[in-house]
Amino acid sequence: MSVENVLSLIQENEVKFVDLRFTDTKGKEQHISIPAHQIDADFFEDGKMFDGSSVAGWKGINESDMVMMPDPSSAVLDPFTEDATLNIRCDILEPATMQGYDRDPRSIAKRAEEYMRSTGIADTVLVGPEPEFFLFDDVKFATNMSGSFFKIDDVEAAWNTGTEYEDGNKGHRPGVKGGYFPVAPVDSSQDIRSAMCLIMEEMGLVVEAHHHEVATAGQNEIATRFNTLTTKADEIQIYKYVVHNVAHAFGKTATFMPKPLVGDNGSGMHVHQSLAKDGVNLFAGDKYGGLSETALYYIGGIIKHARALNAITNPSTNSYKRLVPHYEAPVMLAYSARNRSASIRIPVVPSPKARRIEVRFPDPAANPYLAFAAMLMAGLDGIKNKIHPGEAMDKDLYDLPAEEAAEIPKVAESLQQALQYLDADREFLTAGGVFSDDFIDSYIALKTKDVERVNVAVHPLEFELYYSV
């Protein structure tokens, strides 16, 4: 969409506000709303100044001025606001140079795509993430000196089979690990997901399917069509915005937290990816699983750098409560055709044009711009250095003998460990100036604060284990 198209859209839809949006390091959308009558063609040249020191992990107060530069191609009407509002995504620029800020996730994603093209390896990267989420009726939590707790409830939860309700307990609900594909009334989220899908399509996403996921208490997934890297990251931010707001409208609360429930599956964000050049899928070939040698090298790069990637693709302390065996979480750094216990799967596809890999360890807490860019950089490093991933593992990796399992590398065991790997293994990210050392240092510092806060927190389970010693 051009600037002229945006200005026409504002006029034709009697738009009252333009909502400028950007994504911070943690992956959360931020915004500022401007009366639409202030928007003209010059606005798309000059941008909007703002205080970058107020964004966690960004600039200090002594150099806080930054520019939000609206991208007219991202303009979309907001279906949730009372007054007609047009959302426009922004890149964050340095005012002195008007170049992308090195800590701006969207600018990093764009640089990753530019770097890929500069290598001559490929001109297009296609990304197809599958974020899962939970819908709850009620969530309470508190952390202070007097105590800590969280309490989740949902009418669909397996623990509510004996709960008394005013209009009676209807009994239909998925059990633990029993939520995959049952029809209503066991699946109580059908209409909510349908409403989400309709709004996602209204906002430009292509929805392929929606369904209940494995876990009890309202785990769900909506599958959307793949897209190029930065555009798909934009779409994931729209996806999350829609899920949160439709859930709210239905009297529910949505979370993309990787592991809100103990004892059932967590939420992942498997990421399908492939490279193309001149319209030809570079991952299709005659090697294992119908892959090309290029695809195998790409896998090799992902596996080699996986533990550093974990700091970005699994960026919360909670992420590592999901990455444990037997909850469909891929902890083994291996690849396989169809085998879902491997961290990288080669899906069955109807034609070579659709050949791709699926990286299964990421989760939806990840900043999509950073996660997709980091995986691309790891894959490109594998191709450039011809890193072969070794033999495929066509067996259930969860049931291997201990000696055999010990020989297979695994994902990082904690966020703290992943950050250490990122600190030591960063050159693949800084190639071509895509990620800067300054960004990586600031990212590690920001996430280390989370680790330190969790490490010193007194956990309720510690009272169960140790109160009576």
Swiss-Prot record:
GO terms for cellular component: cytoplasm; membrane
InterPro entries: Gln_synt_N, Gln_synt_N_sf, Gln_synth/guanido_kin_cat_dom, Gln_synth_cat_dom, Gln_synth_gly_rich_site, Gln_synth_I, Gln_synth_I_adenylation_site, Gln_synth_N_conserv_site
GO biological process: glutamine biosynthetic process; nitrogen utilization
Annotated Mg(2+) 1 binding sites: E130, H270, E358
Regulation: The activity of this enzyme could be controlled by adenylation under conditions of abundant glutamine.
PROSITE patterns associated with the record: GLNA_1, GLNA_ADENYLATION, GLNA_ATP, GS_BETA_GRASP, GS_CATALYTIC
Requisite cofactors: Mg(2+)
Main localization category: cytoplasm
GO molecular function: ATP binding; glutamine synthetase activity; metal ion binding
Residues given in the record as L-glutamate binding sites: N265, G266, R322, E328, R340, R360
Quaternary structure (record): Oligomer of 12 subunits arranged in the form of two hexameric ring.
Family according to the record: Belongs to the glutamine synthetase family.
Protein name per its UniProtKB record: Glutamine synthetase
Native species: Vibrio cholerae serotype O1 (strain ATCC 39315 / El Tor Inaba N16961)
Gene this chain is encoded by: glnAv
